[in-house]
Amino acid sequence: LKVLSAGALTAGNVTSVFAGIRKTLSADAVGILYDGTICIGCKACEAACKQYNDMPPESANLEKATGVDGIWDESYDLSEKTLNKIKLYEHGDASTHNSEENGFAFVKKACMHCVDPDCVSACPVTALVKNDATGIVEYDKDACIGCRYCMVACPYNVPKFEYAQAIPEIVKCELCNHRQAEGGIPACCEFCPTGASLFGKVTDLLEEARKRIKLVAGSTYEYPMRSLDEGDVSPKTVAPYINYIYGEKEGGGTQYLLLSAIPFTKLGLPELSATSSASKSEGIQHGIYKGMIAPIALLGGLLYGAYQTTKNSEG
């Protein structure tokens, strides 16, 4: 019974911390607001991303499938050669932009830069770390051992592995931190012709997103271009937004926020709880080992059980 009691104590600690440890961002954390309602699917963001991150084009698969030569780039999804990807939603005759029925729309896939990243928690060698100031999830190739735990842990299937390389690395978007270090912004935001990809501080982007979902469909709104700090705008007709900001709560929140006129599940985005898997697992660990009470109690129970077993066998 005492052995069971020790086990129950441990289980009790696990239950009490299962809600997890919630993490917050610094006031200077940066991110991207992607507004699918004003995206035209031109893929200028993809081309710019490849150019400024030295990523090679992917054309072999499409050329092989279509028999057409000379296609510069057409990746199917995120890969070790593609850090962001515009995907198309279609329904019925796809005649109306931003319509769930018989319509079409676009969504952009890239690293979400989670507030509490599962990939960072899963990495055993801290090859993936979250920058304390910017919040960007950064990769250290020199620390990486190629275990690929981050790939399994990520709920968005973002990190990719260079299987074809002799010395492979993990590949993912880092919000063009090399450009930011020189005073620039992510290439996908700088070269987006409509403002669909918008750079800024996460707090400001959230404020902008909340403003947009309250807009009246059919009205005109001056959409900021490239970066919130620039002040450049482009007037456009407002689409019927879904009253939801994807990334505000998912998995504890993300620095990559999305708006759309189409339900996000139909765009291939996962439904996640408001708590990250990382916070749950770390909360359990911290709860169990806090003060070493549970391990000591468990050890005491096991020793008592062993003593009783030995005593009974000798008797």
What is the role of each PLM region?
Residues L1-G315:
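Non-ligating segments of multi-cofactor redox enzymes
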